[in-house]
Amino acid sequence: MQNINPTSTAAWKALEAHKGTLENTTINDLFQQEKNRFADYSLTFNNEILVDFSKNKITRETLNLLRRLAKECALDEAKEAMFSGEKINRTENRAVLHTALRNRSNTAVLVDGKDVMPEVNEVLAKMKAFSERVISGEWKGYTGKAITDVVNIGIGGSDLGPYMVTEALRPYKNHLNMHFVSNVDGTHIAEVFKKTNPETTLFLVASKTFTTQETMTNAKSARDWFLATAKDEKHVAKHFAALSTNAAEVEKFGIDTDNMFGFWDWVGGRYSLWSAIGLSIILSVGFENFEALLSGAHEMDKHFRNTPIEQNIPATLALVGLWNTNFQGAQTEAILPYDQYMHRFAAYFQQGNMESNGKYVGRDGKVISNYQTGPIIWGEPGTNGQHAFYQLIHQGTTLIPCDFIAPAKTHNPLADHHNKLLSNFFAQTEALAFGKTKETVEAEFLKAGKSLDEVKDVVPFKVFAGNKPTNSILLQEITPFSLGALIAMYEHKIFVQGVIFNIFSFDQWGVELGKQLANRILPELSGDEQVTGHDSSTNGLINQFKAWR
């Protein structure tokens, strides 16, 4: 991948000038000028996902310049480098090949001259065989009872992805009860212990190195809890499996290495749900549905790799997002799924985007000072968010572009719930784009029998400026296939932006310093003596903690 500061390109400079030409133009103006705006500014994937980006403050010229920017930043070259197994994660000297995990075509993917697909398929086959034994009840616990509960112990990518997907695909789940433990706060796992029976519980310990502090602390507590009932350490093998590559530590823990499911250093944590880390997904919805999830992602991979940029959905979303953050002044993006099963989707891509593109050093090793990299990502399901933070989106002083996501078909057709939900989905993007003028507010008061003199002090508060950018992403239905495609779409959006931002999207050095300092502080917490080795604030906090505990 090349080192190209995007602000040095002709396209960026042209975009700066172009921004000025739209300064007094609103989204409403653009709809008045372009009668076919919806058709011209929307794309469809596989007749399953419709992406409408028409309610952004963009024109054809904007899109053409953004596409030029992508070209001048060598996006196509970077894309091929990723798919072909080049080590584009240069700070860790690793390939980036989560796409190989869902490569349903089985065409060879080479890393250091070796095809990785045989190993990928071998792990998939092993996961299938294991999951079928557990789901069918053939796998027995130490007292001969079938497994009823599965507890996934992991953190970050080893938790967020599997948890999000198992929740999103809850309509497809089987009889097994799924639990996810991530926080090192003992409360998290203690609450799971209250709901489970050691005789019928299977723990999945998800840690590539089998040394992750939070995960191994929870895993050891789970082992202690289990052995308090089971007594004999040989029973651990019937109730624990490992998603790891450290066979020595796995064996030392008491897990049979036959029940160890490996993955590779070219799989980043936040892109790992497609790997052995997805075992909890398989145990929840079955292997066929997991395969459909992989297939949906693979189809989006093909679309992203092979489709010209003009019709390329992930690239288009990336470019529009970049326009909003770097040329319209936004610092944040909200992801708002109008589907309760998708309640962890925003949290998942909060990690996906912010850990990938939350960087301030460019690929050239220089500090980035004249453009924005990754935005702040957040969100909640609709309609809950409407009664919480939409006030600020509509009438606040901060510009917040939003992605609205909804399925046309619901898995739970109760009375008119879904029509009411979707009426809000459609209404919100309309309200954000077009707002409500002072004249409309006054007309509404007059119609209600009020005089303008009576209401003149209230009118300004009921005006909506509009001109707030949104994307609408409408799925036919949330299925394993369409969810896989949707996740891959957002993954590739993040990749495109990282290429243009000239950063390394697949490392995460920003998480290291806090961990290092925590390791230094931990032994200081065990005694009663005063701590003096930090700044006055940290010393004061630690010493107050010691006094109060």
Swiss-Prot record:
Domain of life: Bacteria
Pathway membership: Carbohydrate biosynthesis; gluconeogenesis; Carbohydrate degradation; glycolysis; D-glyceraldehyde 3-phosphate and glycerone phosphate from D-glucose: step 2/4
Active site: 355, 387, 515
InterPro entries assigned: G6P_Isomerase, G6P_Isomerase_C, Phosphoglucose_isomerase_CS, SIS_dom_sf, SIS_PGI_1, SIS_PGI_2
GO biological process, one term: glycolytic process
PROSITE patterns documented for this protein: P_GLUCOSE_ISOMERASE_1, P_GLUCOSE_ISOMERASE_2, P_GLUCOSE_ISOMERASE_3
Keyword vocabulary terms for this entry: Cytoplasm, Gluconeogenesis, Glycolysis, Isomerase
An example Gene Ontology molecular-function term: monosaccharide binding
EC number(s) recorded for this UniProt protein: 5.3.1.9
Chemical reaction(s) catalysed: alpha-D-glucose 6-phosphate = beta-D-fructose 6-phosphate
Annotated S-S bridges: none
Location of this chain's protein in the cell: Cytoplasm
GO cellular component: cytosol
Presence of keyword Isomerase: yes
Family: Belongs to the GPI family.
Purpose of the protein: Catalyzes the reversible isomerization of glucose-6-phosphate to fructose-6-phosphate.
PANTHER family: GLUCOSE-6-PHOSPHATE ISOMERASE
Protein name: Glucose-6-phosphate isomerase
Organism of derivation: Mannheimia succiniciproducens (strain KCTC 0769BP / MBEL55E)
Name of the coding gene: pgi
